[in-house]
């Protein structure tokens, strides 16, 4: 090989080597370095352990079990064949249940945030600091609706976290969790923000932050940090079919948690605005049925009697498009916005009613402590009426109307093959509206059913066990 050609090969090799080094350096720069963040934030993250005393139902050796409640023949068998030992009085022994979780210090004088489910019903709460010292904690208050709890330990000059703004958090942003999964203190995991504003079943007042950060039992109550080292959420839940982490974790936005903690510190409880409605999502078929251009808003499925919405003129079948200028994209947006108001504050609603836009001003009330439940009543023997939907219906009795807070409607007595069976209607279901029209009686129901359009989504309001929702169906040609 000639010398010029050898030089050419060597230069090409050197160029490739340099390019590889540059690409490696760029890749290293693209990946975040969490070390400084962890060193600065870890001291303010704590382990939380609880103890709870529970009645011990175990039977001591040689002791006669409590046979009360057994059928006579079994009780006689055990009394004949087991040694006659004195029975243990109920509740005279106790066992101790323990649980583990995480938390973080938000003030140098000892206020600690964690999850409600970490400390619920605890008789004793121990906070272990990063230096492994332990402090007894006092429960300042809890808010089960957001799963936030505020604790207080005696201390001075304690390390604290920096609080961020969860509203500024962006999907795709790097985040990091520090906690005690399975009791392993100060374990660090990282990931990205997968989505914002998630709503989970039974958690309508929290717009959760979804991440792919590995969260396991013991992480609950621990902080979720952004890359600035600021807490942007409280790790709260995971979605799993295996019992372990599956890539879906949910954190309570720190803005929500701080608002709750401030109220707990000041009043010992949390106050929220309340409209007094049951709402549901507007899907494509419902949007077509109610004359909307696209699926959006919150459909009012039920208006509670004497509630703020009823007094303010909101009606069943209204679609709420915005509140105080903020659009309702998903139905879950409404509880978040209403919950942020105080008793007596105004909610300016933009709605669609019968295809027309209009505005309502409603003074919100205070969210009751207990959920409102409406009984289903007992079925009466009113005259039946059949129709083209494949259902046999009857008028509601006066008792049913009172129980369900309805002025009219019909109860399904029988479901035959047809559209009703296909959409899952059952005997006992109550229908109050059909094709956006209120139903007064079985006769009216049949008359409206005769005029239903074909090959177009038609809405029907159904109450099952006191719970109302709109469903849609289509009649074929």
Curated annotation (Swiss-Prot):
<dbReference type="GO" id="GO:0006508">
    <property type="term" value="P:proteolysis"/>
</dbReference>
<feature type="domain" description="PDZ 1">
    <location>
        <begin position="264"/>
        <end position="355"/>
    </location>
</feature>
<dbReference type="InterPro" id="IPR009003">
    <property type="entry name" value="Peptidase_S1_PA"/>
</dbReference>
<dbReference type="Pfam" id="PF13180">
    <property type="entry name" value="PDZ_2"/>
</dbReference>
<keyword id="KW-0645">Protease</keyword>
<comment type="similarity">
    <text>Belongs to the peptidase S1C family.</text>
</comment>
<feature type="domain" description="PDZ 2">
    <location>
        <begin position="361"/>
        <end position="466"/>
    </location>
</feature>
<feature type="signal peptide">
    <location>
        <begin position="1"/>
        <end position="27"/>
    </location>
</feature>
<keyword id="KW-0677">Repeat</keyword>
<comment type="function">
    <text>Might be efficient in the degradation of transiently denatured and unfolded proteins which accumulate in the periplasm following stress conditions.</text>
</comment>
<dbReference type="Pfam" id="PF13365">
    <property type="entry name" value="Trypsin_2"/>
</dbReference>
<dbReference type="GO" id="GO:0004252">
    <property type="term" value="F:serine-type endopeptidase activity"/>
</dbReference>
<dbReference type="InterPro" id="IPR001478">
    <property type="entry name" value="PDZ"/>
</dbReference>
<dbReference type="InterPro" id="IPR011782">
    <property type="entry name" value="Pept_S1C_Do"/>
</dbReference>
<feature type="binding site">
    <location>
        <begin position="275"/>
        <end position="279"/>
    </location>
    <ligand>
        <name>substrate</name>
    </ligand>
</feature>
<dbReference type="InterPro" id="IPR001940">
    <property type="entry name" value="Peptidase_S1C"/>
</dbReference>
<keyword id="KW-0346">Stress response</keyword>
<keyword id="KW-0378">Hydrolase</keyword>
<feature type="binding site">
    <location>
        <begin position="218"/>
        <end position="220"/>
    </location>
    <ligand>
        <name>substrate</name>
    </ligand>
</feature>
<feature type="active site" description="Charge relay system">
    <location>
        <position position="147"/>
    </location>
</feature>
<dbReference type="GO" id="GO:0042597">
    <property type="term" value="C:periplasmic space"/>
</dbReference>
<keyword id="KW-0720">Serine protease</keyword>
<keyword id="KW-0574">Periplasm</keyword>
<feature type="active site" description="Charge relay system">
    <location>
        <position position="117"/>
    </location>
</feature>
<feature type="active site" description="Charge relay system">
    <location>
        <position position="220"/>
    </location>
</feature>
<protein>
    <recommendedName>
        <fullName>Probable periplasmic serine endoprotease DegP-like</fullName>
        <ecNumber>3.4.21.107</ecNumber>
    </recommendedName>
</protein>
<keyword id="KW-0732">Signal</keyword>
<dbReference type="InterPro" id="IPR036034">
    <property type="entry name" value="PDZ_sf"/>
</dbReference>
